[in-house]
């Protein structure tokens, strides 16, 4: 059937419902940036659900193939009818039938992805019944509402390697650190690849080197290294709002920064190293007037979920995935 019209009352109902679920969600929902098929279901009461199937292939040689399947089909549903489970179920069934006619949707390195608000419990059972698994979370932290942010702590002077006092030092990463940043970053990808959404590809390290060089090329990059006795034990890298424009439409406040990744050496876990890195980033982001910071973590990562919760992040969107894309039930 043709996609229903959400004009007039349908859009208003959808907006009211969404903002009741989570006031940090954006409205209207992000449009698919690539062309795709419009989908929709309706009932006697008017529009129940609609979405647009976004098709795209990860760009070879970039970091994009490391963050998911080589070919992806994504849906961000808008639910306007009173029965969320029924509307979503009909939309997913229509999407399944659409993908069945798309050549290659059953190939191994494909995925069907639904972005669903994390606080919206009404769709969870429907997604599970249609063959989707919750794999990734986009989490959000809002800047504290208080007096002006405390000034940044001056960075300590470099110490000689091997001074042996065991002191943890956090410093800004600079261009000469680009290769080190890439080598630490790939450890994050290797660890997260255990949880189903992230993949190390043959050219991932080369792509990370290019990404690190670009990040560190500017003045005062948002990247920090933690060192103990002169040895690197941690890394945090983030994008300022002007570079985080690709993810900013997923949240209803601005400006938004994006925490790209954080690595802590396994021997350092529980020592406060990760907390020091996060505090450095938060102080700088808050001082710059950033309203919200966003990050992704793997839903099944037993370390990420409690760590980021302790540091003020909570789920905003959950990525549900069926692999291959034809696996939707």
Question: What name fits each language-model region?
Answer:
Residues 2-33, 192-211:
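Conserved GNAT-fold acetyl-CoA-binding loop/helix
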Residues 114-115, 259, 293-297:
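Conserved hydrophobic beta-strand within the GNAT/NAT acetyltransferase core sheet
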Residues 118-134, 275, 288, 299-317:
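Conserved active-site alpha-helix within GNAT-family acetyltransferase domains
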Residues 53-58, 197-201, 205, 210, ...:
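A conserved beta-strand-loop-helix scaffold within acyl/acetyltransferase catalytic domains
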Residues 1-12, 169-184:
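A short beta-loop-alpha structural element at the N-terminal edge
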Residues 84-101, 261-264, 270-283, 287, ...:
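Conserved acetyl-CoA-binding loop-helix of GNAT-fold acetyltransferases
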Residues 26-98, 233-255:
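Conserved donor-binding loop and adjoining core beta-sheet/short helix segment
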Residues 79-153, 164-165, 318-324:
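Acyl-donor-binding surface of acyltransferase catalytic domains
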